[in-house]
Amino acid sequence: MVVSRDKAPSAQETFLQMAQAAGLRGRLLITIGLLILVRVGIFIPVPDIDRQAFSQAINDNSVIGFLNIFTGGGLSTVGIFALGILPYINASIIMQLLTAAIPALEDLQKNEGEAGRRKISQYSRYIAFGWCIIQGLGLTVGLLRPYANNYGPLFIFQTVLAITAGSMFVMWISELITERGIGNGASLLIFVNIVATLPQTLGQTIEYAQSGGRQSITAVVLLMLVFLVMIVGIVFVQEGTRRIPIISARRQVGKKLYRERTSYLPLRLNQGGVMPIIFASAVLILPSSLAGFATGNEGLGGFGEIFVQISNALRPGTWVYTVVYSVMIFFFSYFYASLIVNPEDVSKNLKKMGSSIPGIRPGKKTEQYLEGVLNRLTFLGAIFLSFVATLPIFVEQATGVTTFQGLGATSLLILVGVAIDTAKQIQTYVISQRYEGMIKQP
Protein backbone atom coordinates (compact mmCIF):
# COMPACT_ATOMS: atom_id res chain seq x y z
CA MET A 1 0.00 0.00 0.00
CA VAL A 2 1.47 3.34 -1.08
CA VAL A 3 0.81 6.28 1.17
CA SER A 4 1.31 10.01 0.75
CA ARG A 5 2.38 12.61 3.25
CA ASP A 6 -1.16 13.31 4.55
CA LYS A 7 -1.08 13.95 8.27
CA ALA A 8 -2.80 11.35 10.47
CA PRO A 9 -5.23 12.66 13.11
CA SER A 10 -3.88 13.15 16.60
CA ALA A 11 -5.07 11.01 19.50
CA GLN A 12 -7.28 13.87 20.74
CA GLU A 13 -8.88 14.30 17.29
CA THR A 14 -9.39 10.55 17.01
CA PHE A 15 -11.29 10.25 20.29
CA LEU A 16 -13.27 13.43 19.53
CA GLN A 17 -14.43 11.99 16.23
CA MET A 18 -15.14 8.65 17.93
CA ALA A 19 -17.70 10.43 20.07
CA GLN A 20 -19.32 11.91 16.95
CA ALA A 21 -19.31 8.79 14.75
CA ALA A 22 -22.42 6.71 15.36
CA GLY A 23 -21.04 3.84 13.27
CA LEU A 24 -17.89 3.63 15.35
CA ARG A 25 -19.87 3.81 18.60
CA GLY A 26 -21.98 0.91 17.39
CA ARG A 27 -18.90 -1.16 16.54
CA LEU A 28 -17.35 -0.45 19.93
CA LEU A 29 -20.58 -1.40 21.74
CA ILE A 30 -20.83 -4.64 19.73
CA THR A 31 -17.20 -5.50 20.55
CA ILE A 32 -17.55 -4.77 24.27
CA GLY A 33 -20.88 -6.62 24.49
CA LEU A 34 -19.54 -9.74 22.78
CA LEU A 35 -16.40 -9.78 24.94
CA ILE A 36 -18.55 -9.53 28.09
CA LEU A 37 -20.73 -12.37 26.78
CA VAL A 38 -17.68 -14.63 26.40
CA ARG A 39 -16.46 -13.75 29.89
CA VAL A 40 -19.87 -14.64 31.35
CA GLY A 41 -19.91 -17.93 29.42
CA ILE A 42 -16.66 -18.99 31.09
CA PHE A 43 -18.55 -19.31 34.38
CA ILE A 44 -21.39 -21.45 32.96
CA PRO A 45 -20.36 -24.84 34.43
CA VAL A 46 -20.15 -28.23 32.79
CA PRO A 47 -22.44 -30.51 34.91
CA ASP A 48 -21.48 -33.41 37.22
CA ILE A 49 -17.95 -32.23 38.11
CA ASP A 50 -16.36 -31.39 41.47
CA ARG A 51 -15.11 -27.99 40.31
CA GLN A 52 -13.52 -26.98 43.61
CA ALA A 53 -11.25 -30.04 43.72
CA PHE A 54 -10.37 -29.67 40.04
CA SER A 55 -9.55 -25.97 40.46
CA GLN A 56 -7.18 -26.79 43.32
CA ALA A 57 -5.44 -29.41 41.17
CA ILE A 58 -5.04 -26.85 38.38
CA ASN A 59 -3.45 -24.34 40.77
CA ASP A 60 -0.93 -26.95 41.89
CA ASN A 61 0.02 -27.82 38.28
CA SER A 62 2.09 -25.06 36.67
CA VAL A 63 1.95 -26.77 33.26
CA ILE A 64 -1.86 -26.69 33.10
CA GLY A 65 -1.79 -23.26 34.76
CA PHE A 66 0.15 -22.07 31.70
CA LEU A 67 -2.76 -23.21 29.52
CA ASN A 68 -5.36 -21.82 31.95
CA ILE A 69 -4.09 -18.24 31.48
CA PHE A 70 -4.85 -18.29 27.75
CA THR A 71 -8.39 -19.50 28.41
CA GLY A 72 -8.97 -16.69 30.91
CA GLY A 73 -9.55 -19.12 33.76
CA GLY A 74 -12.08 -21.10 31.72
CA LEU A 75 -10.19 -24.33 32.29
CA SER A 76 -10.05 -23.98 36.09
CA THR A 77 -13.76 -23.11 36.31
CA VAL A 78 -14.63 -26.08 34.04
CA GLY A 79 -17.02 -23.87 32.09
CA ILE A 80 -18.47 -24.55 28.66
CA PHE A 81 -15.79 -22.20 27.26
CA ALA A 82 -12.99 -24.23 28.88
CA LEU A 83 -11.00 -24.42 25.62
CA GLY A 84 -11.75 -20.83 24.62
CA ILE A 85 -10.39 -19.63 21.29
CA LEU A 86 -7.31 -21.92 21.32
CA PRO A 87 -8.75 -24.66 19.01
CA TYR A 88 -9.56 -22.00 16.41
CA ILE A 89 -6.04 -20.55 16.64
CA ASN A 90 -4.50 -24.02 16.28
CA ALA A 91 -6.77 -24.66 13.29
CA SER A 92 -5.71 -21.34 11.74
CA ILE A 93 -2.05 -22.30 12.12
CA ILE A 94 -2.68 -25.68 10.45
CA MET A 95 -4.70 -24.09 7.63
CA GLN A 96 -2.11 -21.41 6.89
CA LEU A 97 0.68 -23.99 6.80
CA LEU A 98 -1.40 -26.15 4.45
CA THR A 99 -2.12 -23.12 2.26
CA ALA A 100 1.61 -22.43 1.92
CA ALA A 101 2.35 -26.12 1.18
CA ILE A 102 -0.53 -27.04 -1.17
CA PRO A 103 -0.64 -25.09 -4.49
CA ALA A 104 -4.40 -25.57 -4.92
CA LEU A 105 -5.13 -23.90 -1.58
CA GLU A 106 -2.61 -21.14 -2.30
CA ASP A 107 -4.29 -20.46 -5.64
CA LEU A 108 -7.68 -20.44 -3.91
CA GLN A 109 -6.51 -17.81 -1.45
CA LYS A 110 -4.63 -15.57 -3.89
CA ASN A 111 -6.62 -15.74 -7.13
CA GLU A 112 -10.22 -16.47 -6.14
CA GLY A 113 -10.76 -13.20 -4.29
CA GLU A 114 -13.30 -12.95 -1.50
CA ALA A 115 -14.97 -16.26 -2.46
CA GLY A 116 -11.65 -18.08 -2.12
CA ARG A 117 -10.91 -16.52 1.25
CA ARG A 118 -14.35 -17.56 2.48
CA LYS A 119 -13.64 -21.15 1.46
CA ILE A 120 -10.32 -21.06 3.31
CA SER A 121 -12.14 -19.73 6.39
CA GLN A 122 -14.71 -22.51 6.07
CA TYR A 123 -11.96 -25.15 5.94
CA SER A 124 -10.44 -23.58 9.07
CA ARG A 125 -13.80 -23.96 10.84
CA TYR A 126 -13.96 -27.65 9.90
CA ILE A 127 -10.45 -28.20 11.29
CA ALA A 128 -11.36 -26.24 14.43
CA PHE A 129 -14.46 -28.40 14.92
CA GLY A 130 -12.44 -31.62 14.70
CA TRP A 131 -9.77 -30.16 16.97
CA CYS A 132 -12.45 -29.19 19.52
CA ILE A 133 -13.72 -32.77 19.64
CA ILE A 134 -10.18 -34.17 20.07
CA GLN A 135 -9.23 -31.70 22.80
CA GLY A 136 -12.64 -31.99 24.46
CA LEU A 137 -12.30 -35.77 24.56
CA GLY A 138 -8.76 -35.53 25.91
CA LEU A 139 -9.84 -33.01 28.56
CA THR A 140 -12.77 -35.17 29.64
CA VAL A 141 -10.94 -38.51 29.73
CA GLY A 142 -7.54 -37.25 30.81
CA LEU A 143 -8.20 -34.40 33.26
CA LEU A 144 -11.82 -34.46 34.40
CA ARG A 145 -12.20 -38.20 34.99
CA PRO A 146 -11.04 -38.22 38.66
CA TYR A 147 -13.38 -35.31 39.47
CA ALA A 148 -16.53 -36.59 37.75
CA ASN A 149 -19.49 -37.43 39.98
CA ASN A 150 -20.88 -40.07 37.59
CA TYR A 151 -18.15 -41.00 35.13
CA GLY A 152 -19.33 -43.07 32.18
CA PRO A 153 -20.22 -42.92 28.46
CA LEU A 154 -23.07 -40.44 29.09
CA PHE A 155 -20.77 -38.12 31.06
CA ILE A 156 -18.12 -38.27 28.31
CA PHE A 157 -20.70 -37.54 25.61
CA GLN A 158 -22.39 -34.60 27.33
CA THR A 159 -19.09 -33.05 28.48
CA VAL A 160 -17.44 -33.27 25.04
CA LEU A 161 -20.65 -31.92 23.47
CA ALA A 162 -20.80 -28.97 25.88
CA ILE A 163 -17.11 -28.07 25.52
CA THR A 164 -17.17 -28.42 21.71
CA ALA A 165 -20.34 -26.33 21.40
CA GLY A 166 -18.86 -23.69 23.70
CA SER A 167 -15.61 -23.47 21.76
CA MET A 168 -17.42 -23.23 18.41
CA PHE A 169 -19.59 -20.46 19.87
CA VAL A 170 -16.44 -18.58 20.93
CA MET A 171 -15.09 -19.02 17.39
CA TRP A 172 -18.31 -17.52 15.98
CA ILE A 173 -18.04 -14.61 18.44
CA SER A 174 -14.44 -14.07 17.31
CA GLU A 175 -15.45 -13.83 13.66
CA LEU A 176 -18.38 -11.59 14.55
CA ILE A 177 -16.06 -9.16 16.36
CA THR A 178 -13.71 -9.09 13.37
CA GLU A 179 -16.54 -8.41 10.89
CA ARG A 180 -18.93 -6.20 12.87
CA GLY A 181 -16.78 -4.82 15.67
CA ILE A 182 -13.35 -3.25 16.10
CA GLY A 183 -10.07 -5.16 15.96
CA ASN A 184 -9.19 -8.80 15.42
CA GLY A 185 -11.63 -11.04 17.29
CA ALA A 186 -9.20 -13.82 18.22
CA SER A 187 -6.55 -11.36 19.43
CA LEU A 188 -9.07 -9.40 21.51
CA LEU A 189 -10.42 -12.57 23.15
CA ILE A 190 -6.90 -13.59 24.19
CA PHE A 191 -6.29 -10.00 25.32
CA VAL A 192 -9.37 -10.09 27.58
CA ASN A 193 -8.46 -13.55 28.91
CA ILE A 194 -4.99 -12.37 29.92
CA VAL A 195 -6.38 -9.19 31.51
CA ALA A 196 -8.82 -11.34 33.52
CA THR A 197 -5.93 -13.29 35.09
CA LEU A 198 -3.75 -10.24 35.83
CA PRO A 199 -5.36 -9.27 39.18
CA GLN A 200 -4.62 -12.71 40.64
CA THR A 201 -1.05 -12.66 39.29
CA LEU A 202 -0.39 -9.15 40.58
CA GLY A 203 -1.92 -10.09 43.94
CA GLN A 204 0.44 -13.04 44.25
CA THR A 205 3.39 -10.79 43.34
CA ILE A 206 2.44 -8.20 45.98
CA GLU A 207 2.00 -10.96 48.56
CA TYR A 208 5.46 -12.29 47.67
CA ALA A 209 6.97 -8.81 48.09
CA GLN A 210 5.28 -8.30 51.46
CA SER A 211 6.29 -11.67 52.87
CA GLY A 212 9.93 -11.62 51.73
CA GLY A 213 11.13 -8.33 53.15
CA ARG A 214 13.31 -5.71 51.48
CA GLN A 215 15.12 -8.17 49.21
CA SER A 216 11.83 -9.41 47.71
CA ILE A 217 10.59 -5.84 47.21
CA THR A 218 13.81 -4.99 45.34
CA ALA A 219 13.40 -8.08 43.14
CA VAL A 220 9.79 -7.19 42.30
CA VAL A 221 10.70 -3.56 41.52
CA LEU A 222 13.52 -4.76 39.24
CA LEU A 223 11.14 -7.08 37.39
CA MET A 224 8.59 -4.26 36.97
CA LEU A 225 11.30 -1.96 35.59
CA VAL A 226 12.20 -4.64 33.04
CA PHE A 227 8.53 -4.87 32.04
CA LEU A 228 8.38 -1.08 31.67
CA VAL A 229 11.42 -1.08 29.37
CA MET A 230 9.79 -3.93 27.44
CA ILE A 231 6.64 -1.87 26.87
CA VAL A 232 8.71 0.94 25.34
CA GLY A 233 10.54 -1.60 23.17
CA ILE A 234 7.33 -3.28 22.03
CA VAL A 235 5.80 0.06 21.01
CA PHE A 236 9.01 0.89 19.11
CA VAL A 237 8.91 -2.40 17.19
CA GLN A 238 5.17 -2.24 16.48
CA GLU A 239 5.38 1.36 15.23
CA GLY A 240 8.71 1.09 13.40
CA THR A 241 8.49 1.33 9.59
CA ARG A 242 10.86 1.66 6.66
CA ARG A 243 9.49 4.20 4.19
CA ILE A 244 10.59 3.40 0.64
CA PRO A 245 10.23 6.42 -1.71
CA ILE A 246 8.03 5.84 -4.76
CA ILE A 247 8.16 8.17 -7.79
CA SER A 248 5.09 8.37 -10.02
CA ALA A 249 5.86 9.35 -13.62
CA ARG A 250 4.31 12.35 -15.32
CA ARG A 251 1.05 11.66 -17.07
CA GLN A 252 -1.41 13.63 -19.15
CA VAL A 253 -5.16 13.30 -18.68
CA GLY A 254 -7.02 15.36 -21.28
CA LYS A 255 -5.41 18.78 -21.39
CA LYS A 256 -4.03 18.53 -17.87
CA LEU A 257 -0.44 17.47 -17.26
CA TYR A 258 0.16 15.87 -13.86
CA ARG A 259 3.73 16.34 -12.75
CA GLU A 260 5.96 13.74 -11.16
CA ARG A 261 5.18 13.23 -7.46
CA THR A 262 6.80 11.31 -4.62
CA SER A 263 4.95 9.06 -2.20
CA TYR A 264 6.07 6.28 0.11
CA LEU A 265 5.68 2.54 0.49
CA PRO A 266 5.73 1.77 4.24
CA LEU A 267 7.15 -1.60 5.30
CA ARG A 268 6.69 -2.37 8.99
CA LEU A 269 9.54 -3.65 11.10
CA ASN A 270 7.16 -6.30 12.44
CA GLN A 271 4.74 -7.16 9.63
CA GLY A 272 2.87 -9.84 11.58
CA GLY A 273 2.12 -7.59 14.55
CA VAL A 274 1.22 -9.66 17.59
CA MET A 275 0.25 -12.81 15.65
CA PRO A 276 3.75 -14.43 15.66
CA ILE A 277 3.71 -14.24 19.48
CA ILE A 278 0.17 -15.65 19.73
CA PHE A 279 0.92 -18.50 17.31
CA ALA A 280 4.28 -19.32 18.94
CA SER A 281 2.57 -19.42 22.35
CA ALA A 282 -0.22 -21.63 20.98
CA VAL A 283 2.34 -24.11 19.63
CA LEU A 284 4.14 -24.23 23.00
CA ILE A 285 0.86 -24.64 24.87
CA LEU A 286 -0.01 -27.74 22.81
CA PRO A 287 2.47 -30.10 24.58
CA SER A 288 1.23 -28.78 27.95
CA SER A 289 -2.37 -29.57 27.05
CA LEU A 290 -1.46 -33.03 25.73
CA ALA A 291 0.51 -33.73 28.92
CA GLY A 292 -2.45 -32.67 31.03
CA PHE A 293 -4.78 -34.91 29.07
CA ALA A 294 -2.32 -37.82 29.27
CA THR A 295 -1.79 -37.58 33.04
CA GLY A 296 -3.58 -40.44 34.71
CA ASN A 297 -4.84 -41.84 31.40
CA GLU A 298 -3.59 -45.44 31.36
CA GLY A 299 -5.10 -46.07 27.93
CA LEU A 300 -2.34 -44.05 26.26
CA GLY A 301 0.37 -46.32 27.62
CA GLY A 302 3.89 -45.07 26.89
CA PHE A 303 2.62 -42.14 24.82
CA GLY A 304 1.33 -40.44 27.96
CA GLU A 305 4.80 -40.52 29.50
CA ILE A 306 6.31 -39.10 26.28
CA PHE A 307 3.83 -36.20 26.33
CA VAL A 308 4.70 -35.47 29.97
CA GLN A 309 8.46 -35.52 29.27
CA ILE A 310 8.08 -33.16 26.29
CA SER A 311 5.92 -30.85 28.38
CA ASN A 312 8.47 -30.81 31.21
CA ALA A 313 11.25 -29.98 28.74
CA LEU A 314 9.15 -27.09 27.39
CA ARG A 315 8.25 -25.77 30.83
CA PRO A 316 8.56 -21.95 30.94
CA GLY A 317 12.00 -20.98 32.21
CA THR A 318 13.95 -23.94 30.80
CA TRP A 319 16.59 -23.41 28.12
CA VAL A 320 14.69 -25.72 25.74
CA TYR A 321 11.58 -23.55 26.13
CA THR A 322 13.62 -20.39 25.46
CA VAL A 323 15.24 -21.80 22.31
CA VAL A 324 12.03 -23.31 20.88
CA TYR A 325 10.05 -20.16 21.69
CA SER A 326 12.62 -17.99 19.86
CA VAL A 327 12.65 -20.33 16.85
CA MET A 328 8.85 -20.27 16.69
CA ILE A 329 8.81 -16.46 16.84
CA PHE A 330 11.31 -16.34 13.94
CA PHE A 331 9.32 -18.85 11.91
CA PHE A 332 5.95 -17.13 12.33
CA SER A 333 7.48 -13.66 11.81
CA TYR A 334 8.79 -14.69 8.38
CA PHE A 335 5.67 -16.71 7.65
CA TYR A 336 3.34 -13.79 8.34
CA ALA A 337 5.58 -11.32 6.50
CA SER A 338 5.33 -13.51 3.38
CA LEU A 339 1.53 -13.60 3.69
CA ILE A 340 1.07 -9.86 4.22
CA VAL A 341 3.58 -8.46 1.71
CA ASN A 342 4.31 -10.21 -1.60
CA PRO A 343 7.25 -8.43 -3.30
CA GLU A 344 6.28 -9.86 -6.71
CA ASP A 345 2.73 -8.47 -6.49
CA VAL A 346 3.94 -5.10 -5.20
CA SER A 347 6.45 -4.87 -8.06
CA LYS A 348 3.78 -5.65 -10.67
CA ASN A 349 1.35 -3.13 -9.18
CA LEU A 350 4.00 -0.39 -9.17
CA LYS A 351 4.79 -1.11 -12.82
CA LYS A 352 1.10 -0.96 -13.77
CA MET A 353 0.73 2.42 -12.03
CA GLY A 354 3.79 3.79 -13.79
CA SER A 355 5.62 4.15 -10.48
CA SER A 356 9.14 3.13 -9.54
CA ILE A 357 11.69 3.17 -6.73
CA PRO A 358 14.49 5.72 -7.36
CA GLY A 359 17.63 3.97 -8.62
CA ILE A 360 15.88 0.58 -9.02
CA ARG A 361 14.69 -0.73 -12.39
CA PRO A 362 11.01 -1.77 -12.55
CA GLY A 363 10.18 -5.46 -12.70
CA LYS A 364 12.46 -8.19 -11.37
CA LYS A 365 15.01 -5.76 -9.88
CA THR A 366 12.29 -4.02 -7.87
CA GLU A 367 10.99 -7.38 -6.65
CA GLN A 368 14.49 -8.45 -5.53
CA TYR A 369 15.07 -5.10 -3.81
CA LEU A 370 11.76 -5.28 -1.91
CA GLU A 371 12.40 -8.90 -0.94
CA GLY A 372 15.82 -7.99 0.46
CA VAL A 373 14.44 -5.05 2.46
CA LEU A 374 11.55 -7.16 3.78
CA ASN A 375 13.87 -9.99 4.85
CA ARG A 376 16.19 -7.60 6.71
CA LEU A 377 13.29 -5.87 8.47
CA THR A 378 11.70 -9.18 9.44
CA PHE A 379 15.02 -10.50 10.75
CA LEU A 380 15.54 -7.43 12.94
CA GLY A 381 11.93 -7.52 14.15
CA ALA A 382 12.14 -11.24 14.97
CA ILE A 383 15.40 -10.77 16.90
CA PHE A 384 13.87 -7.96 18.95
CA LEU A 385 10.66 -9.91 19.61
CA SER A 386 12.66 -12.97 20.70
CA PHE A 387 14.85 -10.85 22.99
CA VAL A 388 11.88 -9.07 24.56
CA ALA A 389 9.98 -12.35 24.98
CA THR A 390 12.82 -14.23 26.68
CA LEU A 391 14.52 -11.48 28.73
CA PRO A 392 12.02 -11.60 31.66
CA ILE A 393 12.56 -15.36 31.95
CA PHE A 394 16.20 -14.77 32.91
CA VAL A 395 15.26 -11.81 35.12
CA GLU A 396 12.71 -14.00 36.96
CA GLN A 397 15.36 -16.65 37.52
CA ALA A 398 17.82 -14.03 38.80
CA THR A 399 15.33 -12.28 41.11
CA GLY A 400 13.37 -15.35 42.23
CA VAL A 401 10.02 -13.70 41.39
CA THR A 402 8.18 -16.52 39.61
CA THR A 403 4.56 -15.51 40.22
CA PHE A 404 4.16 -14.70 36.51
CA GLN A 405 4.86 -18.39 35.71
CA GLY A 406 7.19 -17.44 32.85
CA LEU A 407 4.26 -15.95 30.94
CA GLY A 408 4.78 -12.32 31.90
CA ALA A 409 6.71 -11.48 28.73
CA THR A 410 4.30 -13.25 26.41
CA SER A 411 1.30 -11.66 28.12
CA LEU A 412 2.85 -8.20 27.93
CA LEU A 413 3.72 -8.60 24.25
CA ILE A 414 0.17 -9.66 23.44
CA LEU A 415 -1.44 -6.95 25.58
CA VAL A 416 0.61 -4.09 24.13
CA GLY A 417 0.52 -5.45 20.58
CA VAL A 418 -3.25 -5.96 20.52
CA ALA A 419 -3.82 -2.53 22.09
CA ILE A 420 -1.68 -0.85 19.40
CA ASP A 421 -3.30 -2.79 16.53
CA THR A 422 -6.81 -2.03 17.80
CA ALA A 423 -5.99 1.67 18.26
CA LYS A 424 -4.70 1.77 14.67
CA GLN A 425 -7.91 0.20 13.38
CA ILE A 426 -9.95 2.79 15.25
CA GLN A 427 -7.81 5.56 13.78
CA THR A 428 -8.18 4.10 10.28
CA TYR A 429 -11.95 3.96 10.72
CA VAL A 430 -12.02 7.60 11.84
CA ILE A 431 -9.97 8.65 8.78
CA SER A 432 -12.31 6.75 6.44
CA GLN A 433 -15.32 8.40 8.08
CA ARG A 434 -13.68 11.81 7.58
CA TYR A 435 -13.14 11.19 3.85
CA GLU A 436 -16.68 9.83 3.43
CA GLY A 437 -18.01 13.02 4.99
CA MET A 438 -15.92 15.13 2.59
CA ILE A 439 -17.22 13.17 -0.43
CA LYS A 440 -20.85 13.51 0.66
CA GLN A 441 -20.57 17.30 1.03
CA PRO A 442 -22.34 19.14 -1.85
UniProtKB/Swiss-Prot annotation:
Key word Transmembrane present: yes
A cellular component term, taken from the record's GO annotations: cell envelope Sec protein transport complex
GO biological process entries: protein transport by the Sec complex; SRP-dependent cotranslational protein targeting to membrane, translocation
Membrane topology: Multi-pass membrane protein
Gene3D superfamilies in the record: SecY subunit domain (1.10.3370.10)
NCBIfam families (UniProt xref): 3a0501s007 (TIGR00967)
Subunit relationships: Component of the Sec protein translocase complex. Heterotrimer consisting of SecY, SecE and SecG subunits. The heterotrimers can form oligomers, although 1 heterotrimer is thought to be able to translocate proteins. Interacts with the ribosome. Interacts with SecDF, and other proteins may be involved. Interacts with SecA.
PANTHER family in the record: SECY/SEC61-ALPHA FAMILY MEMBER
Similarity annotation: Belongs to the SecY/SEC61-alpha family.
Transmembrane segments: 29-49, 69-89, 126-146, 153-173, 182-202, 217-237, 274-294, 320-340, 377-397, 400-420
Compartment(s) where it occurs, according to its Swiss-Prot or TrEMBL record: Cell inner membrane; Cellular thylakoid membrane
Source species of the chain: Synechocystis sp. (strain ATCC 27184 / PCC 6803 / Kazusa)
HAMAP family for this protein: SecY (MF_01465)
A GO molecular function held by the record: signal sequence binding
PROSITE patterns, alphabetized: SECY_1, SECY_2
Main location: membrane
Function description: The central subunit of the protein translocation channel SecYEG. Consists of two halves formed by TMs 1-5 and 6-10. These two domains form a lateral gate at the front which open onto the bilayer between TMs 2 and 7, and are clamped together by SecE at the back. The channel is closed by both a pore ring composed of hydrophobic SecY resides and a short helix (helix 2A) on the extracellular side of the membrane which forms a plug. The plug probably moves laterally to allow the channel to open. The ring and the pore may move independently.
Protein name as catalogued: Protein translocase subunit SecY
InterPro entries for the chain: SecY, SecY/SEC61-alpha, SecY_CS, SecY_dom_sf
Keywords carried by this UniProt record: Cell inner membrane, Cell membrane, Membrane, Protein transport, Thylakoid, Translocation, Transmembrane, Transmembrane helix, Transport
